[in-house]
């Protein structure tokens, strides 16, 4: 990847994860990474840890940037877009990791056409995430390559042609860790209920999750086939799965993900209804 200057607007956990990944993979030099945050102490902390250049002024941070990463909370987006409008360098790529912020909203808000919208998930903070992303028509092939390499530093990445997939990704992978944690929590609590000390129950569940995923990835078979391998006729797995099916767990999971997808679509519609008009 060519060495480019990257300005982060907002320097929270996800921005820090991107900085760590970029430096770890030697995709950028510290002096070419600019971190803007209204909290001066946060910028100084990032400078001390990673050698990046801190800013409290967003316009100063983006002035010489080849890429601008929007990594702020959604409730701050409108104000930041208004502040940056007309000031993004013409050649620069804007990469957003803000949930629910559409390409149209960002492009209109900034008066800038080169936009990439992403949907990462929280494991990206440790380089184990999955990020789904889409690019506007104005983004060049070279900029797409830059984005792909940067997002790869957060874990896996999937490029899609249709922005509609971002709402689906929000419900499946973006919100997915919450489903996994809830299932883990239920299993851990069941272990404690049976009599295990909590620390042992946690270790058993965590390694079972980790090992099951790794085993699945190393075997080129359908996940249902692996489930059948551990489900002996009349055995404990068959009994447990019978109760899960009887309780409608499979249907509940499907409906929950569909509900999250519908909510993501609703938030997008609400966003369109509340886009402020220029005066």
Question: Which residues are covered by each model-predicted region?
Answer:
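NAD(P)+-binding Rossmann beta1-loop-alpha1 motif at the extreme N-terminus of oxidoreductases
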Residues: 1-56, 60-63, 129, 192-193
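NAD(P)-dependent Rossmann-like dehydrogenase/reductase catalytic/cofactor-binding core
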Residues: 2, 206-279
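Rossmann-like NAD(P)(H) cofactor-binding subdomain of soluble oxidoreductases
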Residues: 40, 49-50, 58-133, 137
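Internal alpha-helical scaffold of NAD(P)-dependent oxidoreductase catalytic cores
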Residues: 109-114, 130-168, 181-218
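Short pre-catalytic strand/loop immediately N-terminal to key active-site residues, enriched for Gly-Thr
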Residues: 115, 166-171, 223-228
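Residue-level recognition of specific faces of alpha-helices
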Residues: 150, 156, 168-171, 229, ...
């Amino acid at each position: 990847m060519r060495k480019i200057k990257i300005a982060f607007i907002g320097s929270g956990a996800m921005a820090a994860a991107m900085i760590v990944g970029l430096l770890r993979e030697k995709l950028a030099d510290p002096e070419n990474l600019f971190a803007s945050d209204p909290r001066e102490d946060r910028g100084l902390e990032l400078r001390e840890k990673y050698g990046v250049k801190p800013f409290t002024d967003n316009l100063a941070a983006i002035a010489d940037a080849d890429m601008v990463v929007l990594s702020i909370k959604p409730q701050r987006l409108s104000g930041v877009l208004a502040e940056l409008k007309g000031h993004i360098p013409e050649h620069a790529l804007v990469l957003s990791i803000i949930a629910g912020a559409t390409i149209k909203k960002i492009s209109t808000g900034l008066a800038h056409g080169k936009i990439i919208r992403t949907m990462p998930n929280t494991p990206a903070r440790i380089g184990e995430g999955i990020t789904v992303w889409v690019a506007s028509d104005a983004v060049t092939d070279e900029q797409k390559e830059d984005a792909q390499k940067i997002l790869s530093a957060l874990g896996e990445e999937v490029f899609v042609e249709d922005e509609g997939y971002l709402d689906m990704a929000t419900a499946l992978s973006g919100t997915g860790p919450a489903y996994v944690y809830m299932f883990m929590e239920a299993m851990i609590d069941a272990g404690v209920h049976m009599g295990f000390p909590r620390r042992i129950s946690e270790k058993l569940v965590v390694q079972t999750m980790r090992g099951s995923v790794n085993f699945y990835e190393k075997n080129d078979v359908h996940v249902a086939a692996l489930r059948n391998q551990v489900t002996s006729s009349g055995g404990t797995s068959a009994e447990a799965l019978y109760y899960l099916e009887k309780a409608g767990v499979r249907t509940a999971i499907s409906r929950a993900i569909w509900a999250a997808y519908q909510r993501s679509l609703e938030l997008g519609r609400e966003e369109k209804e509340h886009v402020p008009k220029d005066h």
